[in-house]
From Swiss-Prot:
A motif ('HIGH' region) lies at residues 31-41. This is Cysteine--tRNA ligase. It is an enzyme of class 6 (ligase). A motif ('KMSKS' region) lies at residues 270-274. Keywords: Aminoacyl-tRNA synthetase, ATP-binding, Cytoplasm, Ligase, Metal-binding, Nucleotide-binding, Protein biosynthesis, Zinc. Zn(2+) binds at residues 29, 213, 238, 242. InterPro entries: Cys-tRNA-ligase, Cys-tRNA-synt_Ia_DALR, Cys-tRNA/MSH_ligase, Rossmann-like_a/b/a_fold, tRNA-synt_1_cat_dom, tRNAsynth_Ia_anticodon-bd. GO terms for molecular function: ATP binding; cysteine-tRNA ligase activity; zinc ion binding. Pfam families: DALR_2 (PF09190), tRNA-synt_1e (PF01406). ATP binds at residue 273. Monomer. Belongs to the class-I aminoacyl-tRNA synthetase family. It comes from Paracidovorax citrulli (strain AAC00-1) (Acidovorax citrulli). Its EC number is 6.1.1.16.
Length: 459
């Protein structure tokens, strides 16, 4: 196939073909569910939603695994703060996550494993690492990974152990042989809830974060698979540690391709709660509709930084409106399977085949919209809708999208349009203008054409 992907591991563009012909296996690190999803989470899940959509559009079968971390220090603290069980908290936050990302048309993964369901596999993996001399039991009761014993440590980051130590300013701990060593099994501490503890050959405790993903990816996809993805913030140490664990245990490459989406910034500043510029998906959806937020994210390449601002959101809304305006002109023809030999479709495919180049693909959608405006072609409108569908866009009713935000009842608007038509027929143009201006003041734009008068929201 013609698809090329930027591989973080090699720091280069590479031709992609799946290990198993026709079948792509992809693992993405999902949410640690102690709070509502924010726009950074939306960006990550949207990026890999587009990836799996395009792989399927290219005729490939995709097994997409996106995990849920449902045991973690933050989860334990939040459950204690709220006076509820860990399971109550994680069930509540999982349901909220599904609701939020469902609104954004993010398709569910093929498999969504919860960490707490795979503790036996984690214990087995830790046992293998200990037998191979890659793990040791610390005086605290923890089991740690010995990074200096894994020859390839640092290959994803492209840095030596010394560079990683200096860059991360890792604190020296008495029970670690190296400051970069990380915990595989955390010994239970006094006062922790019973549901945060498991009996094990290493003592009562719970798994470390990194071992969770190694165990879940192996259990659901096998020892080696095609794509491992996540946010850029996970490249080190999380993904570096996953490689050390999985490859240390199996002796096989964990993933052929490593993909990382860029950070979200807010008004050109880092997004953080301390700066007061931290927004949940639900907060953003109080300002704009879900498809506008999706379009805002998708039109930026997944590896580039995404700058969130009210201005950029409104620009995205206006741009998406242009595409829906074209689809409102003529009923799109159901074209069935996309003909990739069509010049527009071919340019779209070329863009997406170059590391999922959504900015260039979106540009093709605007080219098509221009052609639909010019020709009123139902076939081209159908192609515009079909190509938009590859990105999870343009599947709604155009008139409904264009009329969002209008408070006036549709029947009342129709009555006023009829009154305006009667005024024009009676050559009472002052009254006709008054009706138009009155509707405009209420956020309604009238559009006259030989076929009659239609309306849409002004914004």
């Amino acid at each position: 196939m013609s698809l090329r992907i930027y591989n973080t591991l090699s720091r280069a563009m590479e031709d992609f073909s799946p290990l198993e012909p026709g079948h792509v296996r992809m693992y993405v690190c999902g949410m640690t569910i102690y709070d509502l999803c924010h726009i950074g989470h939306a960006r990550m899940m949207m990026a890999f939603d587009v990836v799996q959509r395009w792989l399927r559009s290219s005729g490939l079968r995709v097994t997409y695994v996106r995990n849920i971390t449902d045991i973690d220090d933050k989860i334990i603290r939040r459950a204690v703060e709220r006076g509820i069980t860990i399971r109550q908290l994680t069930d509540e936050m999982t349901a909220a996550m599904h609701e939020d990302i469902g609104a954004l048309a993010i398709e569910p993964p093929t498999v969504e494993p919860r960490a707490t369901e795979y503790v036996p596999q984690m214990l087995s993996l830790i046992g293998t690492l200990e037998r191979k001399g890659l793990a040791y039991r610390a005086g605290s009761g923890d089991v740690n990974y010995a990074v200096r014993r894994f020859e390839g440590y640092g290959k994803l980051s492209g840095k030596s152990l010394d560079e990683l130590r200096a860059g991360e300013r890792v604190a020296v701990q008495d029970d670690k042989q190296d400051p970069l060593d990380f915990v595989l099994w955390k010994a239970a501490k006094p006062g922790e809830p019973p549901e945060a503890k498991w009996d094990s050959p290493f003592g009562t405790g719970r798994p470390g974060w990194h071992i969770e993903c190694s165990a879940m990816s192996c259990a659901t996809l096998g020892e080696s698979f095609d794509i491992h993805g996540g946010g850029a913030d996970l490249q080190f140490p999380h993904h570096e540690n996953e490689i050390a664990q999985s490859e240390g245990a199996t002796g096989k490459p964990l993933a052929r391709f490593w993909m990382h989406n860029g950070f979200v910034r807010v008004d050109n500043e880092k997004m953080s709660k301390s700066l007061g510029n931290f927004f949940t998906i639900r907060e953003v959806l109080q300002q704009v509709d879900a498809e506008t937020l999706r379009f805002f994210i998708v039109r930026t390449h997944y590896r580039s930084p995404l700058n969130y601002s009210d201005v950029h959101l409104q620009d995205a809304r206006a741009s998406l409106k242009r595409l829906y305006t074209a689809l409102a002109l003529v009923a799109p023809e159901d074209i069935g399977a996309i003909d990739w030999a069509d010049p527009h479709a071919a340019r779209f495919k070329a863009a997406m085949d170059e590391d999922f180049g959504t900015p260039e693909a979106v540009a093709v959608l605007f080219e098509l919209a221009g052609e639909v405006n010019r020709t009123r072609s139902a076939r081209l409108a159908g192609l515009l809708k079909a190509l938009g569908g590859c990105l999870g866009l343009l599947q709604g009713d155009p008139q409904a999208f264009l009329r969002q935000g209008v408070q006036l009842d549709a029947a009342e608007i129709a009555a006023r349009i009829a009154a305006r038509a009667a005024a024009k027929a009676a050559r009472d143009f002052a009254e006709a203008d008054r009706i138009r201006n009155d509707l405009l003041a209420q956020g309604i734009v009238l559009k006259d054409s030989p076929a009659g008068t239609t309306w849409e929201a002004a914004q």
